[in-house]
């Protein structure tokens, strides 16, 4: 196994074993604080909001990637093994499979024991929609949609960028992702200032989202689900979403599970009608949630396996 392969595998295993320990300082928290400071500074310095937003994007991503590179490089100068360890640790912080499983499991466990109010409360921690009035199937839908969508931007995308460019590129992606979640809104405050961040997030997830859909399709039969259904619904309904990317993994999951996602959600008290994704062949329940979690882990394992095979082939032919 190559050094890069060992670093990637270590990061994945650390995430699968430990998730995001609350005691461990998380780079995304630091990135969020950096964005807040930069936004305040740039709003005072630059009058053109689009220019300010572009500068915010460049500075936040550049500082984040530079800090990651400096940390790995500095550790390597102390000892080569230290650089490997730091790189693996930084890569670990970019992955969210275990935490995504755990957070959605709290919702599922509450529903299984019949505590709908508690399930709604837990769901509110991981979705942007209003959850207070959701029915049980709607809560299950929220849990399934969250796992499916975040399989792309919480697992496959950061892992892909980590494989390509190590910790600096993976953390640069997390910076773009964090920028979008903080300033990528189409409201009066961020319509122009957050434009560059929102578009960059769409661009950064363009390939990973489609790769996630493909990996889910391949993982579906291994998870006891329908690969043919995943492929069919992904092609048919992958664009039934306001995001150019989020609909792809959601459609693949819906097709694999035989459930229907999407539809009307309530945001800040206002119903927002969205297109449906998939066909309601089966109910949204604990079985559907467990199937989505299996798809997430299956897609991640397939990406690691694919990378290992490609690396082996390149090593042999070199």
UniProtKB/Swiss-Prot annotation:
GO terms for cellular component: plasma membrane. The chain crosses the membrane at residues 51-71, 77-97, 153-173, 206-226, 296-316. Pathway: Cofactor biosynthesis; adenosylcobalamin biosynthesis. Keywords: Cell membrane, Cobalamin biosynthesis, Membrane, Transmembrane, Transmembrane helix. It is found in: Cell membrane. One of its GO terms (molecular function) is ABC-type vitamin B12 transporter activity. One of its GO terms (biological process) is cobalamin biosynthetic process. It comes from the Bacteria. Converts cobyric acid to cobinamide by the addition of aminopropanol on the F carboxylic group. Belongs to the CobD/CbiB family. This is Cobalamin biosynthesis protein CobD. It comes from Geobacter metallireducens (strain ATCC 53774 / DSM 7210 / GS-15). The gene is cobD.
């Amino acid at each position: 196994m190559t050094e890069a392969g060992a670093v990637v595998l270590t990061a994945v295993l650390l995430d699968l074993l430990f998730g995001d320990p609350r005691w461990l300082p998380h780079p995304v928290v630091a990135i969020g604080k950096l964005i807040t400071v930069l936004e305040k500074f740039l709003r005072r310095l630059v009058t053109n909001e689009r220019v300010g937003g572009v500068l915010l994007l460049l500075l936040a991503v550049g500082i984040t990637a530079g800090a990651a590179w400096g940390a790995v490089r500095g550790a390597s100068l102390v000892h080569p093994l230290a650089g490997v360890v730091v790189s693996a640790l930084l890569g670990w912080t970019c992955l969210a499979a275990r935490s995504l499983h755990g957070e959605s499991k709290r919702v599922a466990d509450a529903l299984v024991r019949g505590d709908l109010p508690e399930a709604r409360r837990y769901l509110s921690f991981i979705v942007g929609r209003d959850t207070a009035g959701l029915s049980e199937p709607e809560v299950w839908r929220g849990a399934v949609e969250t796992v499916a969508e975040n399989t792309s931007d919480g697992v496959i995308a950061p892992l892909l960028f980590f494989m390509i460019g190590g910790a600096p590129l993976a953390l640069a992606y997390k910076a773009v992702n964090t920028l979008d979640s903080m300033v990528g809104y189409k409201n009066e405050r961020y319509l122009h200032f957050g434009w560059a961040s929102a578009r960059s997030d769409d661009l950064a997830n363009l390939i990973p989202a489609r790769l996630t859909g493909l990996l889910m399709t391949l993982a579906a039969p291994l998870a006891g689900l329908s690969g043919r259904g995943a492929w069919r619904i992904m092609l048919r309904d992958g664009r039934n979403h306001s995001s150019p990317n989020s609909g792809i993994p959601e459609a693949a999951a819906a097709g694999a599970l035989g459930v229907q996602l999407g539809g009307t959600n309530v945001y800040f008290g206002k119903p927002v009608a969205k297109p449906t994704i998939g066909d309601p062949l089966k109910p949204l329940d604990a079985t559907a949630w467990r199937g989505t979690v299996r798809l997430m882990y299956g897609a991640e394992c397939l990406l690691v396996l694919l990378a290992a095979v490609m690396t082996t082939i390149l090593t042999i032919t070199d």
